[in-house]
Amino acid sequence: MIKEEDVLAVLDKPRAVYALQMRLDPSNKSTDALQELLLRMRAAGKVKFDIKTGKWSRP
């Protein structure tokens, strides 16, 4: 299972969902759990999403 702390550690620069998945859990091909976690973190203000580039980053 992917944790918020791990996601924040990987977001040293803006990254797309697939790039995050490959750094966090390359054996899992589905990004559903990661996307759900990212949306919860965005709602809490812990990460932000740039719609123009399609990348996630720290606020």
Residue spans of the language-model regions?
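Short, hydrophobic-biased segments on the C-terminal half of alpha helices
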Residues: 35-39
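Residue-level detection of beta-strand scaffold positions
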Residues: 8-10, 55
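Short, leucine-enriched amphipathic alpha-helices that occur as contiguous helical runs
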Residues: 1-8, 31
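Short, cationic-aromatic polyanion-contact patches
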Residues: 49-59
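Short helix-coil junctions and helix-kink-helix linkers
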Residues: 21-31
